[in-house]
Structure formats: C-alpha cells, structure tokens
Amino acid sequence: MEIPNPPTSKCITYWKRKVKSEYMRLRQLKRLQANMGAKALYVANFAKVQEKTQILNEEWKKLRVQPVQSMKPVSGHPFLKKCTIESIFPGFASQHMLMRSLNTVALVPIMYSWSPLQQNFMVEDETVLCNIPYMGDEVKEEDETFIEELINNYDGKVHGEEEMIPGSVLISDAVFLELVDALNQYSDEEEEGHNDTSDGKQDDSKEDLPVTRKRKRHAIEGNKKSSKKQFPNDMIFSAIASMFPENGVPDDMKERYRELTEMSDPNALPPQCTPNIDGPNAKSVQREQSLHSFHTLFCRRCFKYDCFLHPFHATPNVYKRKNKEIKIEPEPCGTDCFLLLEGAKEYAMLHNPRSKCSGRRRRRHHIVSASCSNASASAVAETKEGDSDRDTGNDWASSSSEANSRCQTPTKQKASPAPPQLCVVEAPSEPVEWTGAEESLFRVFHGTYFNNFCSIARLLGTKTCKQVFQFAVKESLILKLPTDELMNPSQKKKRKHRLWAAHCRKIQLKKDNSSTQVYNYQPCDHPDRPCDSTCPCIMTQNFCEKFCQCNPDCQNRFPGCRCKTQCNTKQCPCYLAVRECDPDLCLTCGASEHWDCKVVSCKNCSIQRGLKKHLLLAPSDVAGWGTFIKESVQKNEFISEYCGELISQDEADRRGKVYDKYMSSFLFNLNNDFVVDATRKGNKIRFANHSVNPNCYAKVVMVNGDHRIGIFAKRAIQAGEELFFDYRYSQADALKYVGIERETDVL
C-alpha cells in the first residue's frame, strides 16, 4: 500500500525553504573557505619571507664590512641644506652631507593598460556592467545622474550586486552540484523514513514466513540500489527553478545536472569522441567521423583553428578551386604497383574525376569489355545492389568537401547517375591485415586523392598501392565516385568579355549611387537557386564572394581583376570597389604570387599580407602619446591596420558613454554591424592623434570577405614625423576633445 504524497503546494514550499537554507549555508561555507585559504597563503608567504630574511642576515654577518670614512661638509655654500645619513648596520657612523636638489623631470603622459594585437578580435557583448568606473570626485559630485544612466544601459545588471536581488543569482556549476547533492540527502532521508514505517508494518505480518529465493533476490537488488547514487527528485529542480528563475526551467536544470555529473566522471568520454588514431584503441570509422573535429574547429576563411574573427559564422561552400589537378602517374611506381594488374590502369583512370576522360559530359554508358567474365559483371552488380541503400550523393559530398579548399562543412549535392558497370580486376587475394587507423586514414585520403592509389600508399607508409587498390575495391569506393556532373571542368566562357564589361559598370554604378550604408558580409547559402532579391548578399548590397554557396557563374559574384599593373588606380575593378585583390581570383596582377611579399607587383594586397611600416611610440607634441613613423613613405602607401576588439554597435554605444566621460575614445566604425574598439586591445596606430590637416587617412577595405581598416599616407611622409588622421569629429566634439592643433609646416 502506497503512502499518499502531501499536497504539491506544501511540497514546493518545503523545498523552497530547503533550497534557501542550503544555498545560504553553501555561500557562507564558500566565503569561509576563501578566507581560510587566503589566511593560509598569507601565513605560508610570510614564513617564506622570514626564512629568506634570516638567511640574508646570516650572510651579512659573515661578511667583513668596513665603515666608510665620513666626509666633512664643505663650507662656503650656506644656501645648501645639510642632511644626516644613518646606517642600520652597527659600526657605521652617521654622516652629515650637503643636500643637492635635482632638476624637475617632465612627467610621462598617462597611459592606460592595453594588450598588443595584430588583427581584429571578435568579442561578445557585455550585458552586465563589470565595474562602476571611477571618474573622479568632481564628476561624482557634479554629474550624479551619469552612474544611474550607465547602470540603466545595462538593464540594472552590475557584477556582484546580483546576489542581493532575490531570484537574479546565476549559480555556478560547482555550487549547483553541491546544492543539488545537499538537497538530495533530504529526499533520501524522507524515503528511508517512509520505507522504515512500511517495512515495519509488513515485518509484523511476515515474521514467521520462511526466507524464499524471491525475498533474497529483492534484498540483493535493494542493496545494489542503495549503493548507487540516486538521481534527484524532480521537485528539487522545480524548487531551484522557482527560487532562481534566471538559471532556467526545471528540465534545463535536470539536463545540466546530468551533464555535470557525467563530466565529473574521469572514465567518461566526451560526446562524439573518436579514439586517437595514433593510439592503441584506434577504430575504423567513416570519413565524416574522422574529420568531425576538423570541420568543427577549422575556419576555412582564415585557415586557422579556433578562429577569433569568425567564431559565429561558419558557412559551407562547394566552389571548386582552380588549382593544378593531381593525376595518376602513367608509369608503375614499383613492383607492387596496382598499375601492373591487368585492366587496373584503365579502370582507375575511367573512374577518376580528375582525369581528362571525365571532362566531357557522357551521354551514354561505356560498354562492358568482352574480356570481362559474367561472374565479374555479376560481382559488380551485387556490389552496387549492396550499396544501393547508401546515399551516394551524400557520400560524395562529404568526400569532396575536403578536396574543396573553400569548404567549411560537408555539404549535400545532387546524386550523380549510376556509374557504368565495368569489370572489376580480379587480383590474387592476399591476407593483408588492415588496422582501424589505416582504414580510417585511407577513407580520409580517398576523399582528396580519389583513385590515385600510389599517392595514398605513400601517405599511409605501411601498405603498397596494390594493397590499397584491393582495399578500395573491397570497400566499393571506386563505384561511388561520380564521374559526370560534379567534377566536370568549367563551362564554356561564351560571353566572357561582355559579362566582364557589364560587371565593371555595375561596380561603378554601385560606387556612385550608394549611400554610406555598409553592411557586414555573410556568405549566402542557397545552392539550388540563383541569387535574387532574397539573397542576403544582394539585400545588403554586397558582392558574392568565393565563400558563398551560389553558382560560380553567379552575376553577383565578384570575379576579381585582370590587371597587369600595380592595381593602384581606378582602372582596377578591385581598387574601384574599395577592396583588395584576392589571390584566388586575381591571377594576372601578381596578388597570387607568394614567393616574395616585398617584390610583388600588385600594390593592392598590403593589408592581407601585413606589409605595415615600422612605427614608434613616444610622447606627442599635441596630446598624450603619439605614433611616429621610422621610415619614409610615399603618397597613398599603406602604413598600418587599425586593429582592436570587434564589437557590435549596441556594445559600442554602451562603451562610448564611458569613453566620452574620460574624453578618450578609440572606437572606429567598421560597418553598420560592427565597430573596432582599440581601448583594451590594439596596436601602436591607436595612438595616432587627430588633426584637421592630417598626413594620413583611414579607409575601410574589403579583404577576403572581411572589412578591415587601413591607414594610408595622404602625402609623402618623412621618417620621424608624427602620424595624424582625421577622426571626423563634429565642430562641437572637436572643440571638446581636441585641445591643441598641431603646427602645419608650409611645404
């Protein structure tokens, strides 16, 4: 007979009281532990200092110190003050000397701490005010409403004050685990009490019953359950959610507790974890599983792991690079080469999408060779039927994604038509053992090198290309390769010159008509339809870049330039569109030449190559610190990139109100979505001061899909000059923030 549960309202009230009391107890315990830890560290450090001081005193006692004879003060300088020098060491007599005053030294300008940075660093918005800035006593007395307005900009959220507001505490993971475990003990005690009362009633009626096997089994199972840790009751999570609503709903808390307990287990593996391919526990897995971390962590836009510039915008791309193809070698690589097998070379070349024979779109299937036996043909048919339930198009998409240097994640493409039935080369089967690591590596290499088994064997290093070929036939990977639509060469360029002229006119119209609205570039992702008014690139008036997943022949895609000069005039489409030449698109101007960065003919790729000038930081003649150039530069030559934190416009508004009070701001508008803030992180160009007659100018340039700020020379600048550029202040702000205008030299 089950014991009736108390009413739900009483249970929730009971658990709320328990949650509050346990949370307050844990807070006091944490504070006590922190205080005890600080005291223990202080005592330990003080003991170390005492020990070191005692050692030094003993060393000083062993030294033979001779007192220096005191010098008599020179008379005749009555205006000089006398001072007495006393020594703490015994044996040294006091000395009386004349005091000589030093000349006044100019103070170093005030500089707030900042971290050096060589590229933009995207950060998240700060929705909680970390600290209330100190503006001085004068500002505090005169403008008392500033602090209130600042706190209101963060919706009243200040770090450290959330504990005083009931229900607004964000519980840390450690405290959350301890709180749930502590509350779980109360539920265990209640259940034990209920079980004791129910067991007592049952034992009275069953005292004389014999111990049966069934009762023994129940007793053993009860002991096992009691030994294991019981999962907390749902009422506990409901009570915590009602007391701390900002931490989520009860289901979220339950899932959070389950994840934290699994993470605390040292033997538990993380989710979607593949064993180390170099370890003894390597497994034979599919290509997608082997490259899961690669596709997740590697940024295809800047070719880095854990990129800080595109952490939230990972977009796929199926655009095929126009690079040199890897072809199968015509001659065998050795005695164990697969090309020595009868028909293997023709078989691999026919199914290799990178060979010339696959360049034309085949309208009919090849006829099976007469030398091929019926058994071989039936074997191929059986292999195809066995693989019919696999998605051929998806397998190819995941394989071709790695060969694509612009692809971020495996993408889906249309399934290719069924490959022709060809005779499988029958080779004497050799008992070759493949480890899990070798099989996984083969599947990874096969997505890049396809049927070039000689290259795959060289990369594996443990198998011959004949063995690799036999394993590929066994895996039926050769039959999965599409040969028609996916890997066909570029289409005929019929209206190339006409389209290019129309494209250049479009750039000029866009340059003339458009307003100052510049939006951040986001790659479009609609491979099945052309770019129209719903395309995000067209909606934001951006060109489709090489990272977009639209058709390579898209009319909105920027194809690069065909210049053969320095690309520093408006004759260059890239320079006209205020963007740097792309090394993957501009193949004739020299932007794609990477052998020597300083001798490259194209002058419109300095930002992406980091060809900045040597700058010096020194006190400025205008205000505070200034940036000086160490080498002379010519007009319109690139000097440096303005780097800093990449923040949103809303975050810039919140930070700007504090910077205006300090009368020092390093905010620079990048586009309508983001702002570069060099206050906390930046480079030396952040110290360049404002002037209405500057020698530099700033320009926002599109560099490989990213807006970046370049500082260029407005005129010829000599070595040692201080750099100035126009902050574009209004007249009121210029009088407010700019105190001294630099003296302009008459040239």
From Swiss-Prot:
Compartmental location: Nucleus
Biological role: Polycomb group (PcG) protein. Catalytic subunit of the PRC2/EED-EZH1 complex, which methylates 'Lys-27' of histone H3, leading to transcriptional repression of the affected target gene. Able to mono-, di- and trimethylate 'Lys-27' of histone H3 to form H3K27me1, H3K27me2 and H3K27me3, respectively. Required for embryonic stem cell derivation and self-renewal, suggesting that it is involved in safeguarding embryonic stem cell identity.
Quaternary structure note: Component of the PRC2/EED-EZH1 complex, which includes EED, EZH1, SUZ12, RBBP4 and AEBP2. The PRC2/EED-EZH1 is less abundant than the PRC2/EED-EZH2 complex, has weak methyltransferase activity and compacts chromatin in the absence of the methyltransferase cofactor S-adenosyl-L-methionine (SAM). Interacts with EZHIP; the interaction blocks EZH1 methyltransferase activity.
Predominant localisation class: nucleus
Pfam families associated with the record: Ezh2_MCSS, EZH2_WD-Binding, PRC2_HTH_1, preSET_CXC, SET
Originating gene: EZH1
Transferase among keywords: yes
Example of a GO cellular component annotation carried by this entry: ESC/E(Z) complex
Transmembrane spans: none
Any one biological process term the GO annotation gives: anatomical structure morphogenesis
Motif Nuclear localization signal: where in chain: 491-496
Residue span, CXC domain: 504-606
InterPro entries: CXC_dom, EZH1/2-like, EZH1/2_MCSS, EZH1/EZH2, EZH1_SET, PRC2_HTH_1, Pre-SET_CXC, SANT/Myb
EC id: 2.1.1.356
Keyword annotations of the record: Chromatin regulator, Isopeptide bond, Methyltransferase, Nucleus, Repressor, S-adenosyl-L-methionine, Transcription, Transcription regulation, Transferase, Ubl conjugation
GO MF entry, a single one: molecular condensate scaffold activity
Protein name per the record: Histone-lysine N-methyltransferase EZH1
Residue ranges, annotated region (Disordered): 188-231, 378-421
Family membership: Belongs to the class V-like SAM-binding methyltransferase superfamily. Histone-lysine methyltransferase family. EZ subfamily.
